[in-house]
Amino acid sequence: MAGYLAKQMGLPVGKLVCASNKNDVLTEFLETGHYNKKREFYKTSSPSMDILVSSNLERLLFFVCGADKTKEYMKSLAETGEYQISEDELFKIKRDFVGYACSDEEGAAAIGRLFKDASYVLDTHTAIAWAASDKYLRDCGLQTKNVVLSTASPYKFTGPVLAALGEEASGDDKADMEKLSEITGTEIPGPLSAIFEKEVKHRDIIDVDRMKDEVKKYASEGKE
């Protein structure tokens, strides 16, 4: 969405590649104009991409379709779990966007390849974006410059990043961060390394059916 707004403001870019993992609801939408959240949900190594409902898409629809149509589509999504935009609206979106979905395996391959070729350590989300970008360039036969927006630190996802680099994670967050730092020659971000010196404030694990009661409890305690 940020790339779209930048382009509208005059940034000279071509297509904006929307990358998805196995949860490919956006990839399907950008191809067909049909948004359908009634599908299986997958847990992947890029959890911030594990979605069935995209809030940014609603923002894009506002710019392309206007407020009234966006409200209509969101109402349909809430009530039926799906909606279909018009051919003209889809054409407008396709002028700027193309969607690609990549698997965990493709993301892991991107992490390994880029570290080998450029000594750069991708996180699992940026790896999906890199793999999607690579697919787009190969499909189009383009030799143009392509910018991949990196969204997170590999130190937040040490398990799958280490695995992609051919190393085994221990499951201990601190030890795995130190291992990743050692084998890649990169520094652990200060805010993450400082976590281990902080006091643990929240230890409760709450079942879903208890969430409302716990929220009321916390709110009540906060008023005292």
Where are these regions (language model features)?
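PLP-dependent amino-acid enzyme catalytic core
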Residues: 1-224
